[in-house]
C-alpha cells in the first residue's frame, strides 16, 4: 500500500552539525527485531499487548506477516515474554508464518528485550530494524523506505508524521506556552539502523534511565538520526479505542 498524501508531507530532516554519520551498512542481511514481551496495561487486563487479537489474529501475527512481505527483510526475531508459557505461545504463533522468523526470550523492559534480540542475531545481519508489534498495520512501503535509507548510508532512520494538533506546554492545569509544531514530528516504527550503530547505542545506554525508543539511544551518543515519511496506518494500538480504529482499517483493506 502506498503512503497517503498526508504522510507525503513529512519532512525528511537533515541532521545538524555533529559527528559524521556511521559508515554505510554494507551488503549483509536485514533483520527486524520485534519486542513483544510487554504487558500493555493500557489495553486493559488480559494477554500481553502483542498477543491481543485484531480481526481474529494477534497483533504480533499481523506485524510479522507484514514484515515477511517486505522484500528487503531477510529475518524477523521476536523477543517474547521470558516466562515458559509466554515463550511457548509466541513460538506456536509464529511457527507457520511465512519467512524466517525466530523467537528469543525477552527481558523485563523493552530496551532489555531489544538488546537480547540484538545479541542473538546472526553475524551476517548488517541492517537492523526495530518494530513495535502494536503497530500491526504498518504498510510495507514504510518498511522498505526505512531499509533503503539505511542502505543509502544513514546510520539511524525513523519514519515520522507531521503533528496535526496544536501543542501546548502546561504546568499542572495552566497553559504556559503554545509550542511551534512546524519542527515537531510524531515518530513511528520500524526504526532502522546499521548494526554497529544500534549495538553501540545499547552498549552505552543506562538501564536506570531508559529511552522511549531506540533512536533516542542513538541521539544520546550524538549521532545523526534521519527521517523518512511515515503513514497514518502505522499508528500504535495502545488503547481499546485504537483497536476499534484498527478494526475499521482492516475492514477497509478487505
Each model region followed by its residue ranges:
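N-terminal glycine-rich phosphate-binding loop and ensuing alpha1 helix
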Residues: 2-10, 22-85
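Hydrophobic helical membrane-anchoring modules
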Residues: 2-4, 8-10, 16, 237-254
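Short, conserved active-site loop motifs that form the nucleotide-linked donor/cofactor pocket
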Residues: 30, 100-102, 184
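Residue-level signal for inorganic ion chemistry
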Residues: 34, 60, 117, 131-132, ...
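Acidic helix N-cap motif at the loop->helix transition within catalytic regions
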Residues: 85-92
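Short phosphate-binding loop-to-helix
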Residues: 93-127
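Conserved core of the sugar-phosphate nucleotidyltransferase
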Residues: 138-226
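Catalytic beta-strand/loop signature of glycosyltransferases that borders the donor
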Residues: 226-233
Amino acid at each position: 500500500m502506498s503512503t497517503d498524501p498526508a504522510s507525503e508531507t513529512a519532512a525528511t530532516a537533515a541532521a545538524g552539525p555533529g559527528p559524521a554519520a556511521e559508515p554505510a551498512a554494507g551488503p549483509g542481511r536485514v533483520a527486524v527485531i520485534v519486542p513483544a514481551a510487554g504487558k500493555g496495561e493500557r489495553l486493559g487486563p488480559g494477554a500481553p499487548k502483542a498477543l491481543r487479537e485484531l480481526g481474529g489474529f494477534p497483533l504480533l501475527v499481523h506485524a510479522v506477516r507484514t514484515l515477511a512481505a517486505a522484500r528487503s527483510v531477510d529475518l524477523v526475531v521476536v523477543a517474547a515474554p521470558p516466562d515458559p508459557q509466554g515463550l511457548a505461545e509466541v513460538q506456536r504463533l509464529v511457527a507457520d508464518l511465512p519467512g524466517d522468523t525466530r523467537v528469543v526470550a525477552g527481558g523485563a523492559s523493552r530496551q532489555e528485550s531489544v538488546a537480547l534480540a540484538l545479541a542473538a542475531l546472526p553475524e551476517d545481519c548488517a541492517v537492523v530494524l526495530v518494530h513495535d508489534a502494536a503497530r500491526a498495520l504498518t504498510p510495507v512501503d514504510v518498511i522498505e523506505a526505512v531499509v533503503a535509507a539505511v542502505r543509502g548510508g544513514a546510520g539511524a532512520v525513523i519514519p515520522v508524521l507531521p503533528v496535526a494538533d496544536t501543542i501546548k506546554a502546561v504546568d499542572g492545569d495552566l497553559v504556559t506556552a503554545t509550542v511551534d509544531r512546524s519542527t515537531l514530528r510524531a515518530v513511528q516504527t520500524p526504526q532502522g539502523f546499521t548494526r554497529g550503530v544500534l549495538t553501540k547505542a545499547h552498549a552505552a545506554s543506562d538501564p536506570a534511565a531508559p529511552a522511549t525508543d531506540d533512536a533516542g539511544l542513538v541521539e544520546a551518543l550524538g549521532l545523526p538520526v534521519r527521517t523518512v515519511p511515515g503513514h497514518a496506518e502505522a499508528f500504535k494500538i495502545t488503547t481499546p479505542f485504537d483497536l476499534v480504529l484498527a478494526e475499521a482499517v482492516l475492514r477497509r483493506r478487505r
